[in-house]
């Protein structure tokens, strides 16, 4: 345990996570994606541009090759990858930039790969949330597989409030792939002043840094994640001059060393000068484990003895972090694509490696597109059970059939806990 000053928490806990219903609101529309083409009629890009609350379903499965980054800027949207026929939906060749509020993203894979120019590679994330001209809020990213970024696999940009990032795979961020700063490989960045961020039950595998990294000014709950083969950092922090005080609860994360892991890695790395630069920070640590390293670096930073953040009611993490993450994380846990299956197998065997190029691990295996019209229930936006709409109950059943874990929004035979606002 760190040789740190422990003080009492000074504020009431913040609730972390989002209770949004996305596009599943009365008066919404169902939009069918019918082609893997980058653009045009029936494409995902066209669906993103549609106005008004919407649930996007997929009548096609396979790989969408993006000609450029794809951006969602319309609020109240659900991207329901669980509706796609096997092998599901994978985006490649560009980043997904989410710049809208009240959004749910589920059961897709985003694997951009390197671009041809340093200018593009410098911001080649798999998924970016926020970062536009206005703040965004209330976003759930669940059962999404992110890999092969040149910058961050997941970037939660400035001015983002209430995020649930749950049961995802964040893996194999590329190390020497043309980033203008040189060697990279970054898992997840939580930027300054992001509030109420919950990072729960995810697999971080074979990322050199940022598994995740948390900036001063954020309020974040990072718990019950498995971090496998981190290169030089697992969970760590960085200072941003002038930002508001940091609030962080780092709970029950497990770090498993791999072939690329630095011998001195701790589960949580806190800068030794945190107490001087961010004197009002509230950092709570509990139950974090690192094999074979220590849980936390030794230093003069300040901790608190009560968590400054709590999860939304009803989020019940698995009792065994490793088993739960390997069971539930990723786009289609019961029907994994070749990339996720390989990553999970390597983590189980302790052989996962940080890579420079997707070709080192076989790249994407593509077959012909698959087709199956999504059987959306009639009166999809009419009331269903447990305070949900019919379309929500249907999506929950589709997700759990693919291996999604029960959640406040999708209880398994129980009462919905995230009530409609």
Report the location of each language-model feature.
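Gram-negative bacterial Sec-dependent N-terminal signal peptides
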Residues: 1-11
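Acidic Gly/Asp/Thr-rich repetitive segments characteristic of extracellular carbohydrate-active
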Residues: 18-56
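Detector for repetitive beta-architecture
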Residues: 30, 41, 53-55, 61-63, ...
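Acidic glycine-/aspartate-rich tracts in secreted/extracellular proteins
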Residues: 37-39, 61-63, 83-86, 258-261, ...
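Right-handed parallel beta-helix
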Residues: 64-198
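A structural signal for beta-strand register positions
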Residues: 78, 83, 109, 145, ...
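Extracellular beta-rich repeat passengers
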Residues: 214-375, 379, 396
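C-terminal non-catalytic accessory extensions
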Residues: 354-421
